[in-house]
Amino acid sequence: MYSMEQVVNLAKHRGFVFPGSEIYGGLANTWDYGPLGIELKNNVKKAWWKKFIQESPYNVGLDAAILMNPKTWIASGHVGNFNDPMIDCKKCKARHRADKLIEDALDAKGIEMVVDGLTFDQMADLMKEHEVKCPDCGSEEFTEIRQFNLMFKTFQGVTESSTNEIFLRPETAQGIFVNFKNVQRSMRKKLPFGIGQIGKSFRNEITPGNFTFRTREFEQMELEFFCKPGEDLEWFAFWRETCKNWLLSLGMTEESMRLRDHGEEELSHYSNATTDIEFKFPFGWGELWGVASRTDFDLKRHMEHSNEDFNYIDPQTNERYVPYCIEPSLGADRVTLAFLCDAYEEEQLENDSRTVLRFHPALAPYKAAILPLSKKLSEGATEVFAELAKDFMVDFDETGSIGKRYRRQDEIGTPFCITYDFDSVEDKAVTVRDRDTMEQVRMPISELKGFLEKKIQF
């Protein structure tokens, strides 16, 4: 099994991800997506939008503002309840999330336990029972566990006063809920229907870490699917299966993921069913997707605080009710990292070895690389590049031996290398090499576009 360090080193070396503000010593746990990283992440986002918005007869899109009226966050419960259990080491003063310290300590002993949902007293008892130590200095002396609100505060306007206090959104979902009526009316939607959006969110995490898995600035891909009360669990099962199948359709292996249902003690007070789709990272299991049946909690809260009526009148029965909501919430950065980890392989060949990223062609940063066999052939190869670049992200590489160029493309996950050789000038054909099998076939240049279009389908 490869390590997280190997993936991180490749990501930095090959231009997937760079440390943020690196020339100034960086800023803890901030990352910049490089040329290949942004292509990979954009492809993941496009694939999500295609499946959950474009191909769905039920769903439409939205792009709500990051900054919202602060009453939004009072209504949603974030101002009062969006907290993590914080604890400080008395010896080295390091600050930690108590629940994660306990889970890591139990995991090291081979005990699987979800601590989320326990009281502070129960957490404190577990820390004593299992002699939980500070990961920084090894001390077992901690302060009492206390609440820490995760929202970033800022001020709107020129005066820094409590009346001008606003927040960076901690999730994209609330922008959907407050626009429920706008979307429903303008798009003439009947239940069931969904609203999806992709956007940045911000959480002042106590202990971010594991590369891009847990960061304070992150991107979400969220769908809020509204339905009639009583039909919610049926739709919950539908979206849970759809989410899993989307991951499988893009090449994620069944063995690398699991579906974990929340027990009664772990469920949020407003939820009647929640499943986490988790991925087995080199550092352990981590949540990618939370699929939750949120009942009518969110719309009712906003009705109470805004006096806006979110009741829906059923056109067939004339029933009047507040819709229930199913929320599949996916972290764009997390799932991008998961696809990167799942694709990573160090392969031993007969007389050689190679590092290869086995991305599904739909996700690969470059769909193909154009490789002229000699610099004398650059003109003809450039014409092939120009034609394919109208429809696909393709690379052009004329530096080094053809073998080294193949290895470079394997390492960044390019599924097809297209070699333009001396015969290409006459027969208008090229050699296409498959990344995974390394097999090569001769193909007319005129067929390349259709070939790539077929391969990137999922």
Curated annotation (Swiss-Prot):
Presence of keyword DNA repair: no
The Gene Ontology biological process terms listed for this entry are: glycyl-tRNA aminoacylation
Chain positions recorded as substrate binding sites: R97, E171, F218, E219, Q220, M221, E222, E327, P328, S329, L330, G331
Reactions performed catalytically: tRNA(Gly) + glycine + ATP = glycyl-tRNA(Gly) + AMP + diphosphate
Its Enzyme Commission number?
6.1.1.14
- Offer a single GO CC term for the protein: cytoplasm
Keywords, sorted A to Z: Aminoacyl-tRNA synthetase, ATP-binding, Cytoplasm, Ligase, Nucleotide-binding, Protein biosynthesis
Q: According to the UniProt record, which cysteines are disulfide-bonded? A: none
- Judging by the UniProt lineage, the source's domain of life is Bacteria
Subcellular localization is given as: Cytoplasm
**Is the keyword ATP-binding assigned to this protein?**
yes
Per the annotation, which location comes first and is thus the protein's main one?
A: cytoplasm
State where ATP binds: 203-205, 213-218, 287-288, 331-334
List the CDD domains hit by this protein, alphabetically.
Answer: GlyRS-like_core (cd00774), GlyRS_anticodon (cd00858)
GO MF terms here are: ATP binding; catalytic activity, acting on a protein; glycine-tRNA ligase activity; protein dimerization activity; transferase activity
Question: Oligomeric state and partners?
Answer: Homodimer.
User: What does this gene product do?
Assistant: Catalyzes the attachment of glycine to tRNA(Gly).
Of which family is this protein a member? Belongs to the class-II aminoacyl-tRNA synthetase family.
Q: Know the name of this protein?
A: Glycine--tRNA ligase
Q: What organism does this protein naturally occur in? A: Bacillus anthracis
